[in-house]
Amino acid sequence: MIEIKKAKPTSPGRRHVVSVKNTELHTGKPFKGLVEVKKSKAGRNNTGRITVRHQGGGHKQHYRIVDFKRNKDDIVARVERIEYDPNRSANIALVLYADGERRYIIAPKGLKKDMSVVSGEKVDVAVGNCMPLRNIPLGTVIHNIEMKPKKGAQMIRSAGTFAQLVGKDNAYAIIRLRSGEMRRVLLDCRAVIGVVSNSEHNLKSLGKAGAKRWRGIRPTVRGVAMNPVDHPHGGGEGRTSGGRHPVTPWGIPTKGYKTRKNKRSNKLIVQKRK
């Protein structure tokens, strides 16, 4: 059961907090055999230089090893529990296969404890089941889609997201993404039936800057508030508008300027996003 709760304004930090609580989530620790240490990088690369701004600090986290390939075919798995994962917006499910192996998978909406899921070439079109796109009926809502066969799911993994299978053309399936983009994917690529869980994720309001810091996100300082040495918009006597069209700290135009690189996979886009 999902509970959306608005906090009472007992302090400025609590005034705007909106929390989403799922009473069906596991409250204990994760399964120890599928957890790895996650080292904090704080946005630095191997030379110690900042390569991603606004990262650092935050609560210590452990990485849950999630099975994106779903390659354990024709072995039924029972859902032991649904868990919170601090590394992603979606919830994850711990499943126990008939041969005794446990794995984490992305939990689709509607998947509950003691339900069964299975992967394979020809399995039932049911929530949580994984199969190649060639065996999925047109119009089906899917997620966790591979871009290359056997590589593992790369698309549609965030909370509440889904795509729709709208056509099949020779060796390709045509899928419609949430952005409105129509894209061709090889029919041998796999996908999971259903919508990704935790669709209420966007209703959450952190309420204060400190809650961002708990998540390892540092402040974003405006360029006009900096010195000229730090940003093209910096400096000036008194408050200024920056004196030029908006640019990034490296002088590249921003706010509407397209920076997407041309890639080989562009030829697979049938219709661009809206």
Swiss-Prot record:
InterPro entries: NA-bd_OB-fold, Rib_uL2_dom2, Ribosomal_uL2, Ribosomal_uL2_bac/org-type, Ribosomal_uL2_C, Ribosomal_uL2_CS, Ribosomal_uL2_dom3, Ribosomal_uL2_RNA-bd_dom. Keywords: Ribonucleoprotein, Ribosomal protein, RNA-binding, rRNA-binding. GO terms for biological process: cytoplasmic translation. Residues 257-274 have a biased composition (Basic residues). SMART domains: Ribosomal_L2, Ribosomal_L2_C. GO terms for molecular function: rRNA binding; structural constituent of ribosome; transferase activity. GO terms for cellular component: large ribosomal subunit. It comes from the Bacteria. Residues 224-274 are annotated as: Disordered. Belongs to the universal ribosomal protein uL2 family. Part of the 50S ribosomal subunit. Forms a bridge to the 30S subunit in the 70S ribosome. PANTHER family: LARGE RIBOSOMAL SUBUNIT PROTEIN UL2M (PTHR13691:SF5), RIBOSOMAL PROTEIN L2 (PTHR13691). One of the primary rRNA binding proteins. Required for association of the 30S and 50S subunits to form the 70S ribosome, for tRNA binding and peptide bond formation. It has been suggested to have peptidyltransferase activity; this is somewhat controversial. Makes several contacts with the 16S rRNA in the 70S ribosome. This is Large ribosomal subunit protein uL2. It comes from Francisella philomiragia subsp. philomiragia (strain ATCC 25017 / CCUG 19701 / FSC 153 / O#319-036). The gene is rplB.
